[in-house]
Amino acid sequence: MKHSVHFGAGNIGRGFIGEILFKNGFHIDFVDVNNQIIHALNEKGKYEIEIAQKGQSRIEVTNVAGINSKEHPEQVIEAIQRTDIITTAIGPNILPFIAELLAKGIEARRVAGNTQALDVMACKNMIGGSQFLYQEVKKYLSPEGLTFADNYIGFPNAAVDRIVPAQSHEDSLFVVVEPFNEWVVETKRLKNPDLRLKDVHYEEDLEPFIERKLFSVNSGHATSAYIGAHYGAKTILEALQNPNIKSRIESVLAEIRSLLIAKWNFDKKELENYHKVIIERFENPFIVDEVSRVARTPIRKLGYNERFIRPIRELKELSLSYKNLLKTVGYAFDYRDVNDEESIRLGELLAKQSVKDVVIQVTGLDDQELIDQIVEYI
């Protein structure tokens, strides 16, 4: 049986990446620091995924195990030494923390003489995520390890898309996911091109697909949350049931479409259909997706290269409309949740400093015209 090592045994890891790896005939070693999840994986050796649609069918994922990377790093290194593929489903801010362990695993492959090509895919929505991870891993590699990695270890970037809402079940491994999923991998950085996963798309140039996903799904989802919160909606479905909110989301996606078509020459009709499907996904009645989950960490989401400011900057450069995105940014600055540290911090910043200074600090913008435009909506 083929072997995989997957970092991050959370809902996305189990409910999306784990399902695909299982369907491709892999044994999966989940690596995490959550003892409860790791213990359950080792005790049961399987878990269930429920598809959030009519009939609510279930998939049983078997041939799984767990390794606590904090308590048993040597087991992770051993698993990396013999694995056929490595994937991650952890946040960009966590990637540097697994770099040293990955480097030790790569060194172990070198020492063991394992020259089977291996690809490492960071499956979180970050432009250049796998390459970012590689830069972190390189810090811990010996000169011999660097040469070995350059020859045998690939870090192809990936784009992933599946809505997995926050959830809690008696069975800690059980996870509910939406029917839709998309996983795209760039081919130009693959070291093992013969290992092709079914239900995964492979593209020479990944950037158009990452931007299509980030600017459409992530921007649209966050728009639903921030406007929804303003109007008192508790879930994304509730927000979409308000015709006014739905219309505003569609207006934001129309601006995103104009950017994607101008920048990447996407087919207009295909992109319209893609955005129609996104709205339908947000309206899934079998998913309870809390506004608070989607809206959390507004400071991060208002960043210079994030889902709002980046498309706004690029639309402005192209002299295309971004008025509806600006309105959404205003709602994001106004968002408050007592359980979200960033939203509270944002409120504190706005109370102590001028709105303009806070906009500059949070967005990283130096375009005075654009800064002033954002200030008008806060």
Swiss-Prot record:
**Gene Ontology biological-process entries:** mannitol catabolic process
Could you confirm whether the keyword Oxidoreductase appears in this record? yes
UniProt keyword list: NAD, Oxidoreductase
GO MF annotations, alphabetized: mannitol-1-phosphate 5-dehydrogenase activity
One protein family per Pfam:
Mannitol_dh_C
SUPFAM superfamilies the record matches = 6-phosphogluconate dehydrogenase C-terminal domain-like, NAD(P)-binding Rossmann-fold domains
Name under which the protein is recorded: Mannitol-1-phosphate 5-dehydrogenase
Family annotation (HAMAP family): Mannitol_dehydrog
Q: Which residues bind NAD(+)?
A: S4, V5, H6, F7, G8, A9, G10, N11, I12, G13, R14, G15
| UniProt xrefs under InterPro entries | 6-PGluconate_DH-like_C_sf, 6PGD_dom2, Mannitol_1_phos_5_DH, Mannitol_DH, Mannitol_DH_C, Mannitol_DH_CS, Mannitol_DH_N, NAD(P)-bd_dom_sf
Per its UniProt entry, which superkingdom is the organism in? Bacteria
Q: What is its EC number?
A: 1.1.1.17
Presence of the UniProt keyword NAD in the record = yes
Q: Which GO terms describe its cellular component?
A: cytosol
Enzyme class of the recorded protein, top EC level: oxidoreductase
Catalytic reactions of this protein: D-mannitol 1-phosphate + NAD(+) = beta-D-fructose 6-phosphate + NADH + H(+)
Q: Which family does it belong to?
A: Belongs to the mannitol dehydrogenase family.
